[in-house]
Amino acid sequence: MRIIDLFSGAGGLSFGFYYELQDGEFVRRSNIEFVFANEFDAHAVNAFKSNYGDNIPMIEGDIRNITDDKIDELIKGKSIDVVIGGPPCQSFSTVGQRQYDDKAQLYKEYLRILEKVKPKMFLFENVKGLLSMKEIFYERDEEGNIVYEEIEKHRGEHVFKRKKPKIERYGELVIEKIKKIFNDIGYDVSVETKCATEFGVPQNRERVFIIGKRTDLNIEWHYPQGNNTAVLSVSDAISDLPPVGEGKEVSKYNLEPTNDYQRLMRKGSDCITEHYCGEYGEKIRTVIENVKQGQGKDDFNALIDKGLIDRKYYLTSGYKNTYGRLVANQPCTTITNNLATPSGLRCIHYEQNRALTPREGARIQSFPDWYKFDGSRTDVARQVGNAVPPLMAIAFANSIIEALAVK
């Protein structure tokens, strides 16, 4: 099977096609060839290369620089079975309109490569919000440039001003536009929402998976069904990782794994990377120390209203789930690129007074401990939070491999 990975990030989706799960460990698949992968972010590229080396040729940089001649050179006249990965959902929101945002052009580049290589199938995932997203038409001046308006945001006594494009109207659902676009180039498209917990990932992460199959090949495709094992909790995933103090980093295991998931994550690793905690200011530290499992911003402010905590610590910004502490015996909430930030959406450790470490986030995503990331703390958190969970990717890879086995 010959595969191309576009918008690959640090390689979460590639992981599922590169490895399979056998007898409690990740084993490299046979008869799988990655023709090339493409990613723009330099740190994500470094992470990808660190994990796959020369086994997956990486074309670093803007997807627009991958010319048709370059594609011909890479595919060597052979057919492509699957293209995995896809553009961000925002790139579809102004489909069919005159574009000024570079990111909004990405879906066109994706279509260009699909039409060029004509894979038997394609797969990419996106946020659940894609299903409700509508096409946006922006107000424009006589020269066709988008008109911007200034808006004010109030946070307590502070007022922030910023400009945003002025919306003229909303069109039809973006997902319907996507289906039409792919159908026009010869693909039947199916769309389904799946939760990571269905596939042994200890995280309530719902994502939309878009599958395309060529209309001329009569491919029988079925979305993977989740395993029937018990849903894993956040403590099931990370309780064997050593405690980390504020401003500290830990690289040695000091506890034994207590379940199959932890054993799978640790197999092949003799040390821990990216297991560190930043330093907090007095206000953040006060919040963390007073928020219990399942609580968040509103619960903390309620303590202030009761006179139990000084009003100078009152939280005025953020959603209800910000500054939220995880519940030990429940799956983690969705891991995002703010996973190591206490003010993020429910990412405070269920027991320790700190946010999750990047390695804990990677564990919860189902990346094994030997998987490498690259760059600053922000870079690493972005690579972890934006990835498709490897166990989820394996399930989809298995279904696609099965569907194409007779083609």
Language-model region placement:
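Conserved S-adenosyl-L-methionine
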Residues: M1-N55
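Extracellular structured ligand-interaction cores
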Residues: I3, R205-F209, Q330-C332
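Conserved acidic residues
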Residues: E33-V35, D41, G61-T67, D81, K120, T193-T197
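S-adenosyl-L-methionine
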Residues: N46-I75
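Redox-cofactor binding/interface segments in oxidoreductases and associated redox assembly factors
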Residues: G61, G85, F124, N337
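Class I S-adenosyl-L-methionine
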Residues: K70-G77, P87-I309
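C-terminal target-recognition/interaction regions appended to catalytic cores
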Residues: E256-K407
